[in-house]
């Protein structure tokens, strides 16, 4: 249980060092959110 937060912090740190990857991830997350909303509206 103690190792999980550390891994998340390391991942966030690497994302801060690589803004390009962070931009891609945020776009990917936004696409998932949009897809979820559209699926909910259809159903």
UniProtKB/Swiss-Prot annotation:
Compartments, record wording: Cytoplasm
A single GO cellular-component term on record: cytoplasm
Do you know what upregulates this one? Constitutively expressed; increases in exponential phase, repressed by H(2)O(2) (at protein level).
Q: Which UniProt keywords apply?
A: Cytoplasm, Stress response
Q: What is this protein called?
A: Uncharacterized protein YqgB
**Recorded superkingdom:** Bacteria
Q: What is its main location?
A: cytoplasm
**What Pfam families has UniProt attached to this entry?**
YqgB (PF11036)
| Gene Ontology process terms (BP) | response to acidic pH
Q: Which family does it belong to?
A: Belongs to the YqgB family.
Which gene name belongs to this protein?
yqgB
């Amino acid at each position: 249980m103690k190792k999980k937060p550390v891994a998340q912090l390391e991942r966030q740190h690497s994302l801060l060092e690589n803004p390009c990857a962070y931009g891609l991830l945020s776009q990917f997350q936004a696409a998932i959110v949009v897809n979820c909303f559209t699926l909910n509206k259809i159903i």
